[in-house]
From Swiss-Prot:
GO terms for cellular component: dendrite; filopodium tip; lamellipodium; nucleus. One of its GO terms (biological process) is regulation of actin filament polymerization. InterPro entries: Abitram, Single_hybrid_motif. It comes from the Eukaryota. SUPFAM superfamilies: Single hybrid motif (SSF51230). This is Uncharacterized protein F54F2.7. Gene3D superfamilies: 2.40.50.100. GO terms for molecular function: actin filament binding; actin monomer binding.
């Protein structure tokens, strides 16, 4: 029997990049300039809670932020050290996820409120953390590191 190796669906569409500042996150970068923030180092223990925190200025939950229109009106501006969320594991450990890049926060994954373990069990799709854009005409930004190897699927024939 011979096997075949294929790039995952995510890796066929997005390029996987590391963060220059934080080793716990990775970016799935689309050629259109949209970037999905995902976990790079998956915790061993079950994730039991995700806290999207509050902004200092408005005191609002980031996951309830409403963005509208082509200009992304209402989106939050992120700095590399902006905290996106904190998640807690069953073993008592707590992990902070920061943006790592300068950009505009378009969406937080509010599904993580009801099913927080998606961060661990499906990090590249249902368990993504945030979606970031960079403004008109900007396709890449500082803070993204080297390309990471794509995930491969192995099928037996």
């Amino acid at each position: 029997m011979s096997g075949h190796s294929y790039a995952s669906v995510v890796d066929r569409i997005y390029s996987r990049k590391s963060s220059e500042l934080y080793d716990n996150i990775a970016y799935l970068h689309h050629p259109s300039g949209v970037t999905v923030v995902v976990l790079r180092n998956i915790p061993e223990s079950e994730v039991v809670e995700v806290d999207f925190g509050t902004t200092k200025k408005h005191g609002a939950d980031r996951s309830t932020n409403q963005v509208s229109g082509k200009g992304k009106k209402g989106a939050l501006i992120l700095q590399p050290d902006s905290k996106l969320c904190t998640f807690k594991c069953k073993d008592g450990s707590e992990h902070v996820v920061r943006a790592g890049v300068r950009g505009t926060l378009v969406e937080m994954n509010d599904r993580l409120k009801t099913t927080p373990d998606f961060i661990r069990t499906a990090p590249d799709n249902q368990g993504f953390i945030a979606i970031i854009t960079y403004g008109a005409g900007v396709r890449e930004t500082e803070g993204m590191g080297d390309d990471l190897p794509p995930k491969r699927l192995f099928l037996k024939s």
